[in-house]
């Protein structure tokens, strides 16, 4: 083995298998791009993004860790969200929850 070498198993890796998901259509109504990271509580994203915010409470983007989705001004797209796991307690972000979901 070489230091840092990865030895992946054969086959596909399914992210967030078995976790609840929801699909929302998001429109950037602002005049600047908005980029959202993989683990940001989607309910609390920039107010320039228009979507069913209540449907996104307790969810984040269903994308690989460390990645992000960028919404250009005027752009509309559909994204899949996945439920936050663990204790489901949210602090920080935009300060809209600050406790248990």
Curated annotation (Swiss-Prot):
GO molecular function, one term: urease activity
One cellular component term from this protein's GO annotations in UniProt: urease complex
Manganese among keywords: no
Domain of life: Bacteria
Presence of keyword Cytoplasm: yes
Keywords: Cytoplasm, Hydrolase
Pathway: Nitrogen metabolism; urea degradation; CO(2) and NH(3) from urea (urease route): step 1/1
Subcellular location: Cytoplasm
SUPFAM superfamilies (UniProt xref): Urease, beta-subunit
Example GO biological process: urea catabolic process
Reaction catalysed by this enzyme: urea + 2 H2O + H(+) = hydrogencarbonate + 2 NH4(+)
EC number(s) stated in the UniProt entry for this protein: 3.5.1.5
Leader sequence segment: none
InterPro entries in alphabetical order: Urease_beta-like, Urease_betasu_sf, Urease_subunit
Main location: cytoplasm
Record's subunit section: Heterotrimer of UreA (gamma), UreB (beta) and UreC (alpha) subunits. Three heterotrimers associate to form the active enzyme.
PANTHER family reported in the protein's UniProt record: UREASE
Family the UniProt entry places it in: Belongs to the urease beta subunit family.
Protein name per UniProt: Urease subunit beta
Originating organism: Ralstonia pickettii (strain 12J)
């Amino acid at each position: 083995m070489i230091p840092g070498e990865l030895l992946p198993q054969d086959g596909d890796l399914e992210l967030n298998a078995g976790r609840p998901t929801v699909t929302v259509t998001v429109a950037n109504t602002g005049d600047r791009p908005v980029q959202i990271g993989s683990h940001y509580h989607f309910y609390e994203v920039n107010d320039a993004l228009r979507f069913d915010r209540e449907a996104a409470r307790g969810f984040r983007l269903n994308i690989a860790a460390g990645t992000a989705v960028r919404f250009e001004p005027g752009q509309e797209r559909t994204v899949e969200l996945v439920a936050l796991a663990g204790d489901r307690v949210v602090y920080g972000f935009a300060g809209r929850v600050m406790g248990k979901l």
